[in-house]
Curated annotation (Swiss-Prot):
The keyword Aminoacyl-tRNA synthetase is annotated on this UniProt entry: no
Subunit structure: Homodimer.
Statement: the UniProt record of this protein carries the keyword Repressor: no
Swiss-Prot/TrEMBL GO biological process terms: iron-sulfur cluster assembly
Cofactor: iron-sulfur cluster
Gene this chain is encoded by: erpA
Protein name: Iron-sulfur cluster insertion protein ErpA
This protein's GO CC annotations: cytosol
Cysteine-cysteine disulfides: none
UniProt source species: Pseudomonas fluorescens (strain SBW25)
Length: 116
């Protein structure tokens, strides 16, 4: 019997997302704020993404830093987000943080709901 090691695929935090987080943190005047990304049950496809700003980081959170700002993910959410990319997009329909998730087998037209 052989033992295999597993290295989780990193969560990517794009320049555009980091730049927007920095802008929002500067606007609030609180450099302790971090972008927390999470997954909850719900939405039309079974799971949905959520974003919030948070000052607190738990011991078991995953932290991704880029350009002086941090993205934080709890362990339950990370299992669904490993290998995903968090980006910020501006378009005709508005501006928002988006997740490009290779683990999602289906997604909803709204872009915030998915299934695995």
């Amino acid at each position: 019997m052989s033992v295999e090691s597993f290295t989780p695929t990193a969560l990517q935090f794009t320049h555009g997302a980091a730049h927007k987080v920095k802008s929002l943190v500067d606007e609030e005047g609180n450099d302790r704020l971090k972008l927390r990304v999470f997954v909850t049950g719900g939405g039309c496809s079974g799971f949905q993404y959520g974003f919030t700003f948070d000052e607190d980081v738990a011991d078991d959170d995953t932290i991704v830093e880029r350009e002086g700002v941090s993205l934080v993910v709890d362990p339950m959410s990370f299992q669904y987000l490993a290998g995903a990319e968090v980006d910020y997009q501006e378009g005709l329909e508005g501006s928002r943080f988006v997740i490009k998730n290779p683990n999602a087998t289906t997604t909803c037209g709204c872009g915030s709901s998915f299934s695995i």
